[in-house]
């Protein structure tokens, strides 16, 4: 039945957030945290996932009072360091001092740290899930190499169609792992430590290779299975494992991620990556961080934020953006319809459409006007002259109404 709050079904409209505050650094300034939470709530967000480490207790206190739900996450890596942003993205061999994080302390500190984390936060009513990890499969190559749609990094893992040949997957998994799976064993230990301290909330984790993790025993120790970028697996896995709740623990901020869960009662909801821009995972200079969010570093609402506000709130809303047609991925056909040709590259799934919040162009430019709305139809005016009324039902593929202004 998805997620029930006081016996009532509630769809989780969540976001992932990092603990940094942009140029203010990683100190937890209460005023800045509250400002961010209020902005998230203003667009219909009702939940956050603390990616990928414990956040400040003051953040949880604010979520308690604001009515925001929390998927409270412990750690991003276990016994094996990820290193993916050093060795995979940058293609650099980095010293252990900067490429290995909590891994070096896991064996000696994990039990104490996890239990202390649970004890600190267990009395916060906002906490609905304990997450013991995130995309841990990345650190065990025999996981992502055991399934045909998971043959490596750079997004291939996120785009494959559901693979259902469980017999072949398991055979390959056993061959590559040598019959011993440290990941599943560690997950069982961590889940047990959580239950030692708190049995009132379910244990979850952000799983990124469910086609393998469902067979290895990894997900057997989870009460709720978090799916990272695997919307194509929701329906088939619900049929195969109807007894185990699932949730979108990490999702790109695109329409298809929301439509995949909006009308499915058995999925609790999603956590979009991300609520705010964050330090790290940046592109070429001068970028300082990730920009795939609903709000930028200083709190300005992005086009994506306006779009999701139309999805998540019933309050009437219309937001207009523009782009020269020659710079857009959308092109108007001779019949007045629009064709979408996305830019190549695996990172495109996280990027929003190119848009501008302005109307300042040359007279000889062909401009695409795009409208985000939750209204059934919109009429566009330019200098008092109507350019026509368009229905949202005619633009359901992208949920963006469009006009070409020549």
Question: Where are the regions that the model predicts?
Answer:
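Active-site-adjacent substrate/metal-binding segments within catalytic domains
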Residues: 1-142, 185-189, 203
